[in-house]
Curated annotation (Swiss-Prot):
Its EC number is 3.2.2.23, 4.2.99.18. The lineage of its organism: Bacteria, Pseudomonadati, Pseudomonadota, Alphaproteobacteria, Hyphomicrobiales. Pfam families: Fapy_DNA_glyco, H2TH. The gene is mutM. The active site is at P2 (schiff-base intermediate with dna), E3 (proton donor), K58 (proton donor), R285 (proton donor). This is Formamidopyrimidine-DNA glycosylase. Binds 1 zinc ion per subunit. CDD domains: EcFpg-like_N. It comes from the Bacteria. It catalyses: Hydrolysis of DNA containing ring-opened 7-methylguanine residues, releasing 2,6-diamino-4-hydroxy-5-(N-methyl)formamidopyrimidine; 2'-deoxyribonucleotide-(2'-deoxyribose 5'-phosphate)-2'-deoxyribonucleotide-DNA = a 3'-end 2'-deoxyribonucleotide-(2,3-dehydro-2,3-deoxyribose 5'-phosphate)-DNA + a 5'-end 5'-phospho-2'-deoxyribonucleoside-DNA + H(+). The keyword DNA repair applies. One of its GO terms (biological process) is base-excision repair. Its cofactor is Zn(2+). It comes from Methylorubrum populi (strain ATCC BAA-705 / NCIMB 13946 / BJ001) (Methylobacterium populi).
């Protein structure tokens, strides 16, 4: 599933085609994706103009001049093919790293804009979805109401992390993946941030808070590394694994800089460490870490 850097990369790729553009025609080629489309979905979009294309955690939100916002979630394999007004295609060739999962038969939503651009949503597995909600109710809607802080925002610092994790015996990695606490972190970047911080993924999350609730030095370092990993990943265009690629069809490059993710048996890249990268399973997901320098 695309994580925060991949979704942010998609947002940046879609913005030139969508921001300031008016929906001329919306074609639905099936009645549902993961969920049924909202009532009168196409009708409510047609004639409206996109004022802003934003991101909340792993979701895209297009704020419309009608007072509603279009929520877009990519699911496991969702992608957008963009055809610009000049006829250039921002998604040429094979979108996927391992085979063309997204064939034209999986083009489920076609959004034609008055400026001549066309954005097509393709989703082979149909785990993605679209919704329309009043913009004023966006933060309290069912998708976002229980969502935690944005990891790249100023709302997350060492003190906030300590407050969120205080007295929790939950394994640190599981706490970081809890979208009710911090919204947008996923398996890849949590593994990478924990390694950079020298923290074991099974460490109790509460260990990052002092008895008085203040953040430990490790809590502050972890926040710093989370922000650094995400920022670097966005700059690299995300990570291409199986189902994710950028809107222009190019593959994200951050996977070439993985220190631990999917590198079992490799030497730890930390200077002075003689350890190897190992793997454990937590919550049904693979966790990659250095068996020597990531301490409990």
């Amino acid at each position: 599933m695309p994580e925060l850097p991949e979704v942010e990369t998609v947002r940046r790729g879609l913005a030139p085609a969508m921001v300031g553009a008016r929906f001329a025609r919306v074609t639905l080629r099936r009645p549902n994706l993961r969920f049924p489309f909202p009532e009168r979905f196409a009708e409510r979009l047609e004639g409206t103009t996109v004022r802003e294309l934003a991101r909340r955690a792993k979701y895209l939100t297009a704020h419309l001049d009608s007072g509603e916002s279009l929520i877009l979630h990519l699911g496991m394999s969702g992608r957008f093919d963009v055809r610009m007004p000049d006829g250039s295609n921002l998604s040429p060739g094979d979108f996927y790293l391992e085979g063309a999962l997204g064939t034209p038969k999986h083009d489920h939503v076609v959004m034609a804009f008055a400026n001549g651009a066309t954005v097509t949503y393709n989703d082979a597995r149909r785990f993605g979805f679209m919704d329309l909600v009043a913009t004023r109710d966006l933060e309290t809607c069912r998708h976002f109401a229980a969502m935690g802080v944005e990891p790249l925002s100023d709302a997350l610092d060492g003190a906030v992390l300590a407050r969120l994790f205080a007295r929790k015996i939950t394994p640190l990695k599981a706490a970081l993946l809890d979208q009710r606490l911090i919204a947008g972190l996923g398996n890849i970047y949590v593994c990478e941030a924990l390694h950079r911080s020298g923290l074991h993924p099974a460490l109790p999350a509460g260990a990052l808070a002092k008895p008085d609730g203040a953040p430990t030095p490790k809590a502050k370092k972890l926040v710093k590394e989370i922000k650094a990993v995400l920022t670097e990943a966005v700059a690299a265009g995300g990570s291409t694994l199986r189902d994710y690629a950028r809107p222009d069809g190019e593959r994200g490059a951050f996977q070439h800089g993985f220190r631990v993710y999917d590198r079992v048996g490799h030497a730890c890249p930390t200077k002075g460490c003689t350890g190897r990268i190992g793997r454990i399973v937590q919550g049904g997901r693979s966790t990659f870490f250095c068996e020597t320098c990531q301490v409990r």
